[in-house]
Structures are given as C-alpha cells and as structure tokens.
Amino acid sequence: MARFRGSNWKKSRRLGISLSGTGKELEKRPYAPGQHGPNQRKKLSEYALQLREKQKLRYLYGMTERQFRNTFEIAGNQHGVHGENFMQLLAARLDAVVYSLGLARTRRQARQIVNHGHIEVDGKRVDIPSYTLKPGQEISVREKSLKLDIIAESVEINNFVPDYLEFDADNLKGKYIRVPERSELPAEINEQLIVEYYSR
C-alpha cells in the first residue's frame, strides 16, 4: 500500500489528530471534513475504532502499510508488552528522532531532511528515514548542511526535547540516550486497539 500523499489537514480532521505536529489543523475545525461538518460523527464499530487508531499512528509517522506492519511484527518478537514495544520502535526511527530533536518542524520535513542526506549517525551519513537507532548512538547534521535555513529555523523555534534524547543546539548534535518510557510517547494513541486490529 502506498504512502498517503493527500491533504494532511483533511486527514488530521478525519482522524482527530494533528499529523503535522503543529495542531493548526484542528484549531478552527476540530471535526471531520465534509458538508455535514461537526454533526457527522457517529458511533463506530469495534473494528472501525481499531482501524482508525491504526491509521492515526501510521499516518502520524508517514509509513506505508508494509513498513508499519513489519515494524509491528518485529515488536511482537521482543520481550515485553507488544503495543509498547511497537511505540518505542517507531520513536527510535531516525526521522522520528530528527523531528523530536527539533531539527525539523514536522515529521514529513524530518523524512525529507534524512532522505536528502543531511543527517549523520555516529559520523556516517544515513539517508534512510526508517533506520532504527540504538541507545548511545549520536545524530548530527552533516557539516555541509549546517547552514540550511530549514534546519536553523526549526531549531530556533523548538523549546522542548524529550528526556530520552540529548541535544546540543549550538553544534546541531544529539544523542539517543535510551528507549523512551510509554509516558514520553504520543498520549493520544491507544496502541492496544492496533494490537487487536492485527490480531483479528
């Protein structure tokens, strides 16, 4: 299944979550798009709730269904709680960490920054957004990309870096210190519904 490339604003309103990370999509119209507007919400079936939760998380990270499902299966082979493992694996993706460090304003922008070869991991260029970081690995902006406006502007407006990451804003370097706790990951996601969806 291809990655969704349509309007993130409409998709955000339909799913009830900000896919850009800015929250602007839901400020004026916190309801699904369409002529019926706020009145078109209806009670969803159990399956529909599970599907919507899966789509929320998949679109949030900008992944294809195959990528998403593969990561879910990897999480299932780890020790611990399946859903929590899954959320932690997603948070350890290189594009997710670039976004969380504040090197990009949105997750989509973070993917582009990685794809275009602006990021190094432990001193080596990595242009794969799905690259999974391990605790202790260092992330930095390549020397030739240090003066990119898109990165400088993002860092300037960012005022929060999660505790599982370390960031040196002056040198545009960060570190993935540890696996995040569930409480440090998106609270608006109910990953158990996703586990139930794939267990059907």
From Swiss-Prot:
- Going by the entry's taxonomy, the superkingdom of the source organism is recorded as Bacteria
Q: Which Gene3D superfamilies match?
A: Ribosomal Protein S4 Delta 41, Chain A, domain 1, RNA-binding S4 domain
Using the UniProt annotation, give all residue ranges assigned to the region (Disordered): 20-41
Q: Quote one Gene Ontology molecular function term.
A: structural constituent of ribosome
Kindly state which keywords UniProt assigns to this record, in alphabetical order. Answer: Ribonucleoprotein, Ribosomal protein, RNA-binding, rRNA-binding
A Pfam family of the record is: S4
- Cytoplasm as a keyword of this entry, yes or no, is no
Name any GO cellular component annotation. small ribosomal subunit
Q: Which SMART domains match?
A: Ribosomal_S4, S4
HAMAP family xrefs: Ribosomal_uS4_B
Listed under subunit, the entry gives: Part of the 30S ribosomal subunit. Contacts protein S5. The interaction surface between S4 and S5 is involved in control of translational fidelity.
Query: Belongs to which family?
Result: Belongs to the universal ribosomal protein uS4 family.
Q: Quote the protein name from its UniProt record.
A: Small ribosomal subunit protein uS4
